[in-house]
Regions:
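RNA-contacting regions in translation and RNA-metabolism proteins
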Residues: 1-181
Length: 181
């Protein structure tokens, strides 16, 4: 039995100054049974959605089960700002972790959406930082999931003129960019 030791910025709670709480996540080795269960779940779900999708499973260097989906009309699978893809990923994670001991992380992607979204968010962060510097007023972004908020925080963490923090409760939690004092 092999496992990968990983320090993650993922967090269920954030402390008052919004610094991410580091926690250790043990990723278990992905079993063939888990791969089969997740693959079957996705194929059945996508078939029920009336979609023709090819699924490619791979194990990332960090030990995550990475699943890339391809086919026509993948925009439907992505959904508004990736919400459908995120929901399907959540369900795939539940299926994977039901079928084995130890934690398995499942990452779903299609048409390189995750990388494109990350670039879009980094670009948005830089534009908002420029706007905050120019107008000298804080700017609150739209509500985002924890993964997307983390991208915004990371993109601006080395900016000497602005700071970021999150406000609100899930699912309406958003990043606020303010001028440093």
């Amino acid at each position: 039995f092999a496992s990968i030791h990983l320090i993650s910025d993922e967090t269920k709670e954030e402390i008052k100054n919004d610094a991410p709480v580091k926690r250790e996540v043990e990723l278990a080795e992905v079993t063939d049974e888990t791969k089969e269960a997740v693959s079957t779940f996705l194929k059945d779900t996508l078939k029920a959605m009336g979609m023709e999708v090819e699924i490619a499973l791979d194990i990332d260097e960090d030990g995550s089960l990475s699943i890339n989906m391809s086919g026509p009309n993948m925009g439907i699978l992505i959904g508004k700002r990736g919400q459908t893809l995120d929901s399907l990923q959540y369900l795939a994670n539940r299926v994977a972790n039901k079928h084995q001991s130890g934690y398995v992380r499942v990452k779903l992607d299609t048409e390189n959406y995750r990388a494109r979204r990350e670039e879009t968010l980094k670009h948005l962060a830089k534009n908002i930082a420029h706007k905050v510097k120019r107008n000298r007023r804080p700017v609150a972004l739209e509500p985002m999931n924890p993964y997307e908020r983390r991208i915004i925080h990371s993109a601006l963490q080395n900016d000497p003129y602005v700071t970021t923090h999150s406000e609100g409760e899930e699912p309406y939690r958003k990043v606020v960019v303010t001028l440093k004092k």
